[in-house]
């Protein structure tokens, strides 16, 4: 085992991964936040991102099933509640389906995940498997993309409000709520990683786990861009731009 670099330097290393690799720099997000997406492209993003959102509590449940420490389970289980909500209301998944309805999609269709791109499904399922199978330190480290999430949520709220008529408080409730939830989650996760990555090998593994997670996020956007922007090659079985649409866009929404 090699002596770990100091805590501050390791923290800086993790932040640098986000600076270089986080998906806020993907061209699809520039289009989305700048009002450059068509209605079809926005809907495709909502459909595919739903699959990621829906698997987050499954990922966290897999993590908890491996965790022997009750204090850690108590701290982590709120992540499942944040996404699944209560029996009748609340939760990020329900908020995301409100966004789906706001952009003219049938929430039941989106929730079925029938139109999800194969690459999206593959990337997200790989993330769930990673958390289920890797050491706890690496599983926690893979969640640290949350360090960089508040910036993109803020940019998304501002951009959608400026450019798309569907954007109102109800439609954007998911992002506003995440701005409140993420700081708590990332404080715990970051402290755990900094405390437990006590050798250089563990630090390297944690950094690689965070890099893997940025790849998962980037791969989803690459698939979306390829299918619905350019070259516009939609894989068999993926959303065709028509299924699940329940209304046409209003005047200020992105036009075909």
UniProtKB/Swiss-Prot annotation:
Known catalytic reactions: 6-(2-amino-2-carboxyethyl)-7,8-dioxo-1,2,3,4,7,8-hexahydroquinoline-2,4-dicarboxylate + 3 O2 = pyrroloquinoline quinone + 2 H2O2 + 2 H2O + H(+)
Biological-process GO terms, alphabetical: pyrroloquinoline quinone biosynthetic process; sulfur compound metabolic process
Keywords associated with the record: Oxidoreductase, Plasmid, PQQ biosynthesis
Top EC class of this enzyme: oxidoreductase
Any Pfam family: TENA_THI-4
The protein's Enzyme Commission number: 1.3.3.11
Keyword Oxidoreductase: yes
GO MF, one annotated term: pyrroloquinoline-quinone synthase activity
Gene3D superfamilies per UniProt: Heme oxygenase-like
InterPro entries: Haem_Oase-like_multi-hlx (IPR016084), PqqC (IPR011845), PqqC-like (IPR039068), Thiaminase-2/PQQC (IPR004305)
Pathway annotation from the record: Cofactor biosynthesis; pyrroloquinoline quinone biosynthesis
Function comment: Ring cyclization and eight-electron oxidation of 3a-(2-amino-2-carboxyethyl)-4,5-dioxo-4,5,6,7,8,9-hexahydroquinoline-7,9-dicarboxylic-acid to PQQ.
Family: Belongs to the PqqC family.
PANTHER family to which the protein is assigned, alphabetical: 4-AMINOBENZOATE SYNTHASE, PQQC-LIKE PROTEIN
Stated name of the protein: Pyrroloquinoline-quinone synthase
Organism: Rhizobium meliloti (strain 1021)
Gene: pqqC
